[in-house]
């Protein structure tokens, strides 16, 4: 099972790490009750659920301590308690037992994805993977992938105006992409030719990401014999492909409707409405998913741990997937309420990412 990285909210020397078995048992019951029902739970119910014999009064004392630690809180409408986002993070990192998928679940995911992978495009296979994942987890499933991981063949600069040029990028499979590029003042045609020759000697057979990384490294270390204007043309060309606005990334979402299930209040509906809006506009989602591309294994963001878009009240569980060369080429996962069934969803995301990686590896 791939690891999941804590976000660093819980230091080992805090009171949380010192919780005794009784406190952990009571806290676990509060969280598990919340994950199952979404409702606050009171001391009387907890005293019936825990393994050790404790009166409701004793349970209330422990709950007061847990509240002081910031692990649980009392919603204003109820005498019961709910876990805070910090509490959920502590539960996921320290108390939860992550189970394995059953063999039928593994076979089902593998069979469906392998049949699609043989017959259709990578995008279609990823869409199928998400449909499967959203159905199994009852959450929205998302994938962030490069629009194309094809290998590059040729690049050309065509001057449009004194300070604008068209960059024509041709891939080995025949795809052509054009970008308009702002040129530094005073760039002669010879600099465009020199930049084209320099780039074409280095990009052929590479993906866009690989070419970009090598060129940025060469320019930053000044390992070229190029004059300053030509270097500026190359830097501008690299920036035009960098897709900082997410243009070179494709975001696919499946299972929006799952987020509308089991809403408990108007604020739940408002949270989901904002989430729909963010998924529609890609606001922050590309940045969030991109954070998983630099780490192996499953990443978990609970509620406001993610500051990139309005995920307060929601959780994101994501994992990267790789191509045949072992390079990370995308991220997939689920977005749902904070009361996701973490122990079940984490292995599903992990396994789906592994199967997609195998599929892309051929």
UniProtKB/Swiss-Prot annotation:
Keywords: Repressor, Stress response, Transcription, Transcription regulation. Signal peptide: none annotated. The keyword Ribosomal protein does not apply. One of its GO terms (molecular function) is DNA binding. The keyword Magnesium does not apply. It holds the Pfam family HrcA. It comes from the Bacteria. GO terms for biological process: negative regulation of DNA-templated transcription. Belongs to the HrcA family. HAMAP family: HrcA. Negative regulator of class I heat shock genes (grpE-dnaK-dnaJ and groELS operons). Prevents heat-shock induction of these operons. This is Heat-inducible transcription repressor HrcA. The gene is hrcA.
């Amino acid at each position: 099972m791939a690891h999941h990285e804590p976000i660093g909210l819980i230091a080992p020397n805090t009171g949380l790490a010192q919780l005794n078995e009784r406190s952990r048992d009571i806290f676990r019951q509060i969280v598990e009750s919340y994950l199952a029902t979404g409702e606050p739970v009171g001391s009387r119910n907890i005293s019936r659920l825990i393994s050790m014999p404790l009166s409701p009064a004793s349970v209330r004392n422990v709950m007061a301590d847990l509240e002081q630690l910031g692990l649980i809180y009392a919603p204003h409408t109820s005498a019961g308690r709910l876990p805070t986002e910090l509490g959920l993070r502590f539960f996921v990192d320290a108390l939860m037992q992550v189970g394995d998928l059953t063999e039928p679940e593994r076979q089902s995911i593998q069979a469906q994805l392998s049949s699609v992978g043989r017959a259709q495009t990578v995008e279609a296979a990823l869409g199928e993977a998400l449909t499967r994942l959203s159905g199994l987890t009852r959450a929205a499933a998302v994938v962030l992938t490069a629009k194309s991981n094809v290998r590059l063949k040729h690049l050309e600069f065509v001057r449009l105006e004194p300070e604008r040029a068209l960059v024509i990028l041709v891939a080995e499979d025949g795809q052509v992409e054009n970008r308009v590029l702002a040129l530094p003042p005073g760039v002669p045609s010879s600099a465009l030719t020199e930049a084209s020759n320099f780039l074409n000697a280095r990009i052929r057979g590479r993906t866009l990401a690989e070419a970009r990384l090598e060129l940025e490294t060469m320019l930053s270390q000044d390992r070229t014999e190029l004059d300053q204007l030509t270097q500026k043309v190359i830097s501008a060309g690299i920036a035009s492909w960098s897709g900082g606005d997410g243009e070179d990334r494709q975001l696919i979402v499946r299972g929006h409707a799952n987020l509308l299930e089991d809403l408990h209040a108007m604020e739940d509906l408002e949270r989901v409405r904002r989430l729909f809006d963010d998924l529609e506009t890609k606001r922050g989602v590309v940045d969030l998913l991109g954070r998983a591309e630099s780490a192996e294994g499953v990443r978990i963001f609970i509620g406001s741990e993610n500051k990139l878009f309005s995920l307060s009240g929601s959780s994101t569980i994501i994992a990267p997937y790789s191509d045949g060369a072992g390079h990370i080429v995308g991220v997939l996962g689920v977005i749902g309420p904070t009361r996701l069934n973490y122990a079940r969803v984490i292995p599903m995301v992990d396994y789906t990412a592994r199967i997609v990686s195998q599929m892309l590896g051929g």
